[in-house]
Amino acid sequence: MILEHVLVLSAYLFLIGLYGLITSRNMVRALMCLELILNAVNMNFVTFSDFFDNSQLKGNIFCIFVIAIAAAEAAIGLAIVSSIYRNRKSTRINQSTLLNK
């Protein structure tokens, strides 16, 4: 694929994720948008790694590292959302006042 096409696709994914993260009122949707942003960043890592230095796999290795961190972040985030839902019966961001006390 051409470098510009991948960069445009990655920029679209990043902007969709950023828009969803800013406008989201639901915690689960915000986590999904954050994962979309991380996937756009991973696409950039792999694309630039392949385009500039094909012999070394630094971008691919860093991409795998980011995927592992994102999986842990999603698991912890969903556990927190599940706990908040059990206690508050809502996953809306503006109704969560846990940190205000």
UniProtKB/Swiss-Prot annotation:
GO terms for cellular component: chloroplast thylakoid membrane; NADH dehydrogenase complex. Its main location: plastid. Its EC number is 7.1.1.-. It is found in: Plastid, Chloroplast thylakoid membrane. It is a multi-pass membrane protein. It comes from the Eukaryota. Belongs to the complex I subunit 4L family. NDH shuttles electrons from NAD(P)H:plastoquinone, via FMN and iron-sulfur (Fe-S) centers, to quinones in the photosynthetic chain and possibly in a chloroplast respiratory chain. The immediate electron acceptor for the enzyme in this species is believed to be plastoquinone. Couples the redox reaction to proton translocation, and thus conserves the redox energy in a proton gradient. NCBIfam families: PRK05715.1-2. HAMAP family: NDH1_NuoK. This is NAD(P)H-quinone oxidoreductase subunit 4L, chloroplastic. It comes from Barbarea verna.
